[in-house]
Amino acid sequence: MSLAVVPCTDRAVWDGYVDRFQGHPQQLWGWGETKGMHGWSVDRVLVTDDENILGCAQLLVRKLPFPFRALVYVPRGPMCSAGDTTAVLAQLAGYASSRHHGVALSIEPDWDAESPFAPAVAAAGFRPSANTVLIPRTLILDLARSDDELMADMSKSTRANIRKAMRSEVDFRKVQTEAELEQVLGIYHETADRAGFGIHEDKYYRDIFANLGEGSPIIGAFDGEQLLAFVWLSRSGATAFELYGGVSAEGQKQRVNYGVKWAALLAMREDGCGRYDFNGLLNDGISDFKKQFAKHENLLMGTWEKPLSPLYPVYARAMPAARKGLQAARRLMKRVTRR
């Protein structure tokens, strides 16, 4: 069987393949468009045997300092069947090397750590990497379950807070206008300052809202026209994925963050998604809040890299230190700009 890698330049065709392969929303065209506006270049490719499409991947390419040239990264991809994984990855690695001169092909698949995909990834010459972008330890809910089944896995206090919020006069609905989006950004800044995490510039979030459209719903808790809390997601046909969330001081007092999370679950189920991914668990207060919504955790495969250059060992040692330095510089700049 002769395989080839073919670029895809049509948005509708591409997003159709994402849904066909039950792909992740970070593989959607609109997500790539946003990353392409903020430091990456984007290449969407299909792996074909001339008769059938065996797999596909949205490649994000980042230029690196000399002599490394480039990193090719696939967020929550590629997309293919378990039986085709090794062949698809081999084709993608060859393409990443010849077309983009990558020092490595880095993938963070939307596959369970103990799924049949795992040995196929290793067989394709990939190795685990500590250069993680998307956290593999997460919480994924099955939205095929009923309200009662979902709530049964929550803590008693969480159920009580949800029911109280849903009985209140707060209106839980999707954010629709640019003015409402600006309220979202205001609360996100407030939440980031309170919790001490870094965020992008506002234009990044406005671009997500514009480029993904219905593929990036924001569920808000409104008191009249005033936003109190939000959950911002991206979604494909199969999966809803939390991107961001925030709550105002007043929203905290009313505990509407419980209600808005529940409203987001129901909205994504109504939109036809079968999975709801809380997007990572750490050992922090935000993760403690997430863990109140289920009794289990999920572990995805994590980050795997295929070396494409003799310089890969140097890159693999240098990259973690470089990322830490960049993150420290961003935190410093943020503190300076607040003064």
Question: Positions of the model-derived regions?
Answer:
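Active-site/acyl-donor-binding loops of N-acyltransferases
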Residues: S2, P7-R11, T34, L60-V61, ...
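A conserved beta-strand-loop-helix scaffold within acyl/acetyltransferase catalytic domains
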Residues: L3-D50, C56-P67, P109-E114, P119-P136, ...
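Short, high-confidence coil segments that cap the C-terminus of an alpha-helix
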Residues: W40-V42, H100-G102, E270-C273
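Short histidine-centered catalytic/ligand-binding loop motif
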Residues: V72-G83, D193, V247-Q254
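Aromatic (often tryptophan-rich) hydrophobic motifs at membrane interfaces
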Residues: A87-S97, Y204-A316
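Short catalytic-loop micro-motif centered on adjacent basic/acidic residues
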Residues: A104-I107, R173, G274-F278
